[in-house]
Every structure is written in C-alpha cells, then in structure tokens.
C-alpha cells in the first residue's frame, strides 16, 4: 500500500509528515523549514505558496492568509477577477505540501490524513475533505488535532495508563481534549473549544495598540493604509514571538507613512507586561473550555496525569502560566507544538496502512446533533462527546392533520432553541399518506462516520419510504463544483510545472549566451573566422528569441547554438591536444641528456653512501 502522509492544515502554518521505519518524520519544505506558512499569493497569473507568498505580502495585495477561519462558510476571495472559495485556497496549500512530500519520498502521493480542530463543525470538516479532493488527495481520515497530538506523544507510552489533557492553541482556533491512554487504546473522553480564538487574535491586539499609539502621536490612522497594515501585521507577529523569550522588544518601522512634514517612522517599545495586559481577555477565554472539558469527562484537575501543549501560541508565557495555575501542574514540554499534530496524523496514516499495529483510536463528536421540532426547539439525538463512529435513531410524528410532508431541519450545537444553533442542512420526506396528527411514524436516524461527517436519514415506517442526505451546509460544494476545481487545480499544477520549465529554459539560454561570449574570446585567432561568425549569428538569434515568449523558438535556438559551440570546443580540444603532442615530441629529443643527469646524481648519492660507511 502506498504511503499515507499526515497533514496539519493550520491557520497560520502547515506541516506534513510521513511514517518511516515506524517513526513519524516531518518533511522539510524546499526552503528547508519544517513548517510552511499557510499563505497564498497571486501575481501576474502565477501562484506563490508559503514563505515566498508571506514575504511578498507587503507589496502584493493579492495575498491570502488565515483562510482556515472561513472554512465551511460562503466566504469568497476575489483575486484578479476570479472568485476563490476557502476550499480552493486550502487546496493550493495542500497541493504544495503534497508536491514537496512527493519530492522527498520519490514517489507519487495520493492519500492523506488531514487534521482539523476538535471543535470544527460538520460543514468545516466537509470543507476540509473537499479541499483535499481538489488538491488531488484521497482523504483517508479527518482526525482532530488534539487527538493527533496525543497519538504522537503517547506512541511510546502505551504500557502505562494515563489521563492526558491536550491544550491546543493555534493560529486561529483553540481546543481542549481529554484522553485516556492505555494498552494501545487512545480514547477521547471529552473535547471543548473556541473556533474564534488563536494567535491571530493576539497579533491583532498588538496591531490595534500600535495603530492607537501612532494615531495619538501623529494624528494618522494606519489602519486605513493596506501596505502599512501588512507591515504592522508582520511586526506584531515578530514582537509576539520575541516576547516569549525576552521581557521587552523594540518595534521599529521606518517610513511607515508620510505626513505633511515628510516621512514618518514608527518606534515603539513593547514590554511583556504590556502585552499581557493587552491580551489578558484572550488568555482568560481559554479557561472556560478547559473547565468544560473536565466537567464533561467527569474529572477534576487532580485526575490529569499530563498536560500537552500544542500550537505555537502555547509558547506565550501568560498562556503557560494560566494553564499551570488552572490545573496545578507544569505542562509537558517534550513535544514540538508546531510539529506534533502532523506527526500524529502520519501515525494515523500508519494505523490505516497496517504499519502501526495495536493502536486503537476512539474519538468523539465535539457538538450535539439534532433536529428542529415543534415550537422551534432543538431535539438532540446525539449528545456531544459521544464516541464516533456512531448512529442514533428516534421516532417523530406529524404536527398537523393530513400533513403530506415532513421538513427535516438538521442542527449542530448546544443551545435549546433551533435558531441559536448551526444549520447543517434541510431535506424533506414527502408523500406521507393522509392521517390525523400524531399517527404517522417518522424515524429519523443520524450516522456519524470516523471522520465526524454526518449522514441523516428519515423513513416513514408506515410506507417504508425513505430519504437521506450526507450533510452539506449551504456553503458546501456540489460534486460538479469539486470536480471542476479538481480539474482547475490539475491544470494549474501543469501550468506551474510548465512555467518552471520555461524559467529554467530561459535561465539556461542566458547562461549559454554568457558562456558563448567567453568561449569566442578564448577562440580568437585559434579557429577559422567563418566558424566564429556562424557562432555569433546563432548567439544573436538566441538573444533575439529571448526577448519574446516563444519558448519553442528559444529551445530551438538554444539547441542550435549548443551544437555549434560543442563543435568549436571539440576543435579547440583537438588543437590543444596537437600542441601538447608537439611539445611532448620536443621533450623526447632532450630526454637522453635528462637521463644522464639523473644517472650522475645517482652515482653521486652512491659515492656519498660509501664515504659514510
């Protein structure tokens, strides 16, 4: 079975890992980094991904970051006149991860395990699966990030039973999961979280502070200047990271904007104390989900054996201090918070292929599932933190006499009223025979698969008539849309490959022109004038072709010039060899004299030896 890669598709950074020799290994990207910024840029029809796109963001307005925050919504990014869904942008990132994983492994990769925040709802999970499909990946499993982290942490610790709490604060989402580890079984007891809390929010607090300080000093609102805002974003992220290691950092942005008197510069010293003050409310928001997860698992803080920190934002000292204070124990720091999720996904890939044995993963659904019933109430069929895969059925009836159809409004959430929860979808069971209200028996069944994706079925028990749907939110893509996006992605990949080949061809041609100029100088007076003119003419033709975009012509002229230069080089070597031979002949004539000299020296040495004796 071909390898299944593990992908952590993050809000700010992504990573890819693979199982090799029974161990999960992070695959470095072409720049040598172990994580890749989840940033996509479009410039003159070309796509840039990762660090390149992030660096260019200051000058390129067509740059998209933190797209994960829009997964499962109707959000669209319009770039160069084309609308992109979050799934398409995520697919571009996945395609890039896939391509460098293939380069590393030396084989085609078409299967992956992709992680999502534990608190992702059905629409967000479905969108992630669609993104994988668009990128040309068969998504073997969608698993929760904290669960993946626990897998990576606990692979070599399965002989001892322990309860672990995974505290996962990433770039855009926050999750807490509590798991039981023992005898190769990783069982999730509870999960809680906040999909609107992450490192991006900490950055924004710094940005808002810098904007306010600058406005106070200069009367100019930098938030209205896109380029200045991008520079502030980069500076805020850097300052946040710096303050994890030092207590004070200098934010210096020269020429941030211009006032009436000329250029203006931003110079601010940000202390860790000030940063903690600015972000206090964000850190506090991690406490409620932590307590909720403990409550749902029927555990207290003292029952937790180990606290695992996941996600780059857990490096923030105030976050570490808060979790330590809340749970009364020092968090475990033996795993890399940026890499552990992708490694866990790779291990899950190994479980699927059979390379990892005696490991069982029991995950849970993060949110309750149900339908709307009379009075706009949500009736729950599957409670949150139910182990998946699972299915549950319940029988309902009609609300009016002779009701011909039943509308099934599928919901996900914890609020008692339907309107306050997330709508996953709607469908209708029609052709119910006329009968008084309360008589027809309508069985509604929910089925959640191992990826946490929901299928709902409604059946009229009287007639046996049945209707079912795999839930897709209003933002979900149709099979036709996904297929079109797959084709677009493949075409773009082909185009990207062609662009790369053309760039290499142009570079090689430029290099050849340079080499020819150098060679012709060396050949001056050594080969016939006619040969030189022929080479110069071919070189000029290639230079002319390089001014245009006809790559077939560039290739043809390059090949032609190459052939001429090779012939010239052969002649040069032949000439050099002839000269060397002539020189060798001259040396041969002097050889006897040389022999005499050598003999004389030899005699002298012998005489000396005799004297010494």
From Swiss-Prot:
The keyword Phosphoprotein applies. The modification Phosphothreonine is found at residue 173. Residues 578-591 have a biased composition (Low complexity). Disulfide bonds: none annotated. One of its GO terms (molecular function) is ATP-dependent protein folding chaperone. PANTHER family: HEAT SHOCK PROTEIN 70KDA (PTHR19375). Gene3D superfamilies: 1.20.1270.10, 3.30.420.40, Actin, Chain A, domain 4, Substrate Binding Domain Of DNAk, Chain A, domain 1. Belongs to the heat shock protein 70 family. Residues 578-613 are annotated as: Disordered. It holds the Pfam family HSP70. Residues 596-613 have a biased composition (Acidic residues). Acts as a chaperone. This is Chaperone protein DnaK. Keywords: ATP-binding, Chaperone, Nucleotide-binding, Phosphoprotein, Stress response.
